[in-house]
From Swiss-Prot:
Signal peptide: 1-23
Protein's name in the database: Phosphate-binding protein PstS 2
Gene that encodes it: pstS2
Disulfide bonds: none
A cellular component term, taken from the record's GO annotations: plasma membrane
InterPro entries per the UniProt record, alphabetical: PBP_domain, Phosphate_ABC_transporter
Residue positions bearing lipid (N-palmitoyl cysteine): C24
Principal subcellular localisation of the protein: membrane
Function: Part of the ABC transporter complex PstSACB involved in phosphate import.
Assembly with partners or alone: The complex is composed of two ATP-binding proteins (PstB), two transmembrane proteins (PstC and PstA) and a solute-binding protein (PstS).
S-diacylglycerol cysteine-type lipidated residues: C24
PROSITE patterns in the record: PROKAR_LIPOPROTEIN (PS51257)
Length: 293
């Protein structure tokens, strides 16, 4: 098993407060000349799974098993917010994030000359994107769960998706409430959580007596929660694998999201190729100055 530095939100807050985050530098020139500080998501993160697949950082061994080649030098963060905070505080850092979760604290890079925007994802020119899925136990959904899902997939729910910077589904239908009470527990991906929170807020305006509880973790935990019944709906920012699908759950796409490669705002780099990103995250390229060679 690979060993990485692991950062949680609490750890980041403490380290940033005293300015000793491992590998960080306050010299802005280091962002384009010094060592590249890789920041990755944790194993189990759907964003990490999609990122390593789309950039070729993952391969299969002779047994057909997937192998993640993310560099051992990477600092691992346990949520989208920690990823963005870590990169924003380290001039030498590079990481990745859900497009819909981005904020102004980091700089978004072009990939192969294309912008990480909804427009370019829709046109197909920016290819680093993945589905947002909800995961449910087939045939076991409670009436309140079905109603909330109907809202997510409706015109109203998809309008929330689009308003928050994600790509909505086509041909959504009008929502009609079918229940007036109940509770829905939702668990999983920290990338899906922000838009799910917004959907929950909008849903409560039309069906206030249904209690919706959202528990943030990661995609794998969300899928497991749907499988074992501890959650009514799992959130996953990746597709189900064969093992998961065989356990009686199904995935339903609720939106499409891009994955943006991000650096510190002091960094002078604006554009990387797919190969350059792969070489950085696998540890082949370790210095910012190597990118200009």
């Amino acid at each position: 098993m690979k060993k990485h530095k692991m950062l949680s939100l609490l750890a980041v807050s403490g380290l940033m407060g005293i300015g000793i985050l491992a590998g960080c530098s306050n010299d802005s020139s280091s962002s384009s000349k010094g060592t590249i500080n890789i920041v990755s998501r944790e194993e189990g993160s759907g964003t990490r799974g999609a990122f390593i697949e789309l950039f070729g950082i993952e391969s299969k061994n002779k047994k057909g098993e997937k192998v993640d080649h993310t560099s051992d030098a990477a600092t691992v963060t346990n949520s989208t917010s920690v990823m963005l905070t870590t990169v924003s505080k380290d001039p030498s850092a590079i990481g990745y994030s859900s497009l819909g979760s981005l904020n102004s604290s980091v700089k978004v890079l072009k990939i192969d000359g294309k912008n990480a925007t909804v427009k370019d994802i829709k046109s197909g020119s920016y290819k680093i994107s993945r589905p947002f899925n909800i995961v449910t136990k087939e045939g076991k959904e409670k009436e309140a769960t079905k109603d909330f899902i109907d809202y997510i997939l409706s015109k109203d729910g998809q309008a929330v998706v689009e308003k928050n910077g994600y790509i909505p589904l086509d041909n959504a239908k009008a929502y009609q409430a079918k229940v007036s009470s109940g509770k829905v527990v939702i668990a999983g991906s920290s990338s899906v959580t922000p838009v799910m929170e917004k959907i929950k807020e909008a849903y409560h305006k039309v069906n206030a007596k249904v209690d919706v509880e959202i528990q943030q973790s990661d995609s794998s935990t969300g899928i497991t929660s749907a499988i074992d019944g501890s959650a009514d709906i799992g959130m996953a920012s990746r597709e189900l694998d064969k093992t998961e699908s065989s356990k009686g759950v199904k995935a339903t796409v609720i939106a499409t999201d891009g994955i943006a490669v991000v650096v510190n705002k002091k960094n002078k780099v604006n554009d990387l190729s797919t190969k350059q990103v792969k070489d950085i995250f696998t540890g082949k390229t370790t210095s910012w100055s190597d990118l200009s060679k």
